[in-house]
């Protein structure tokens, strides 16, 4: 379960309970994109907890009475599939394992097999807060990114695209792992607190 506190309008290697599968990089784009914007920036705090499936269902039933369900939930939540990038020596992974105060994750995220675009995202840990920036890219450009070809980012006018290109190109980022799971989300009516349940987690050990 993840509880987040957003200041404006989430997993990489957090997969201790993940079941390893054989999803290949090309299969990554057999993926639902929520209503997307071209660039979105969010500052928030996150608190994460492990729980059993029984506990999840019990708490979910309680939240049904006091919070709003995400419009995309459906009967069993919605699917999320993310391809994570890292340097050759897995610097971002090691920074997380070492618990560094300043660290980042770069990922390509898609929610729907029929989607014609994906979200390129960078999450940066800054003390107790996280900053997440997202850029909408076309399906064709997303495929190029899965092949380690980043020049397609140069066609986007936003400085975030240029930042990602420079970082991923100069520091030799490569596709590293795919994480897929189902998410059920709740939103508080009174404020911007969001509670999500992630389950049925699967991941590749390496791309």
Whereabouts are the PLM-identified features?
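Phosphate-end processing signature that detects enzymes handling 5′-triphosphorylated RNA
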Residues: 2, 12-15, 22-207
